[in-house]
C-alpha cells in the first residue's frame, strides 16, 4: 500500500477461504474468515478502524481475481465470518424432530457479515433462499424488501466501504510511521 512517494506498507495475512462463481462475463467473490468466537460485522467499528480485516481480505481477493481473470468483471458477493463451533441444541421438549434439530444447528452456524443485495447473487450463495436464509444474514419481508436485520450492501456500497478501508489503512500506516501508535 503506497503511503507516499517514498513510503510503502505491506500487509501480510492469510484469507481462510475464498469462493468464486463464474457467470458469463462476471466472477463473483465470497470471502470467509473463520473465527473461534462469535463475531458480527460492525460498520461503526469499521469507521473507527477497529474492524478492517474482513474488508481488507475482500479487497485483496478481488484484486487477485481481477489479475487472474482480466476478461471478467469481478464482483464482491459476500464477506462473512463463520463461527467455528460444535453447536448444542435444546432437547428438553421430549423427542425432538430431526428437522428441528437440523434447523437449530444451521441457525447456530449461520454466518455473519455483509452480503450483496442482488437477488441473483443471493441465490448463488444460498440455492434454498426464499424469504429467510438458513446460512446467510439475509431475510425478506412480505413486500420483497430486506428486513432491517439483514446485512446487505449494494455494489455501490461495497465499493464505498472498500475505498474507505483503503483510505483508513493508509491513514493508520502514516500514523504508525509518524510514531503515533
What label would you give each PLM region?
Residues 1-181:
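RecB-family 4Fe-4S metal-dependent nuclease core
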Amino acid at each position: 500500500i503506497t503511503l507516499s512517494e517514498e513510503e510503502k506498507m505491506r500487509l501480510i495475512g492469510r484469507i481462510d477461504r475464498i469462493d468464486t462463481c463464474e457467470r458469463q462475463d462476471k466472477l463473483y467473490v465470497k470471502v470467509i474468515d473463520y473465527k473461534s468466537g462469535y463475531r458480527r460485522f460492525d460498520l461503526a467499528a469499521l469507521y473507527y478502524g477497529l474492524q478492517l480485516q474482513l474488508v481488507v481480505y475482500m479487497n485483496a481477493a478481488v484484486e487477485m481475481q481481477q489479475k487472474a481473470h482480466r476478461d471478467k468483471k469481478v464482483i464482491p458477493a459476500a464477506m462473512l465470518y463463520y463461527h467455528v463451533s460444535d453447536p448444542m441444541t435444546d432437547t428438553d421438549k421430549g423427542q425432538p424432530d430431526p428437522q428441528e434439530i437440523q434447523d437449530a444447528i444451521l441457525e447456530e452456524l449461520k454466518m455473519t457479515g455483509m452480503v450483496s443485495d442482488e437477488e441473483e447473487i443471493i441465490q448463488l450463495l444460498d440455492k434454498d433462499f426464499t424469504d429467510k436464509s438458513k446460512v446467510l444474514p439475509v431475510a425478506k419481508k412480505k413486500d420483497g424488501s430486506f428486513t432491517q436485520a439483514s446485512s446487505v450492501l449494494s455494489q455501490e456500497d461495497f465499493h464505498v466501504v472498500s475505498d474507505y478501508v483503503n483510505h483508513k489503512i493508509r491513514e493508520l500506516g502514516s500514523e504508525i510511521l509518524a510514531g503515533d501508535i
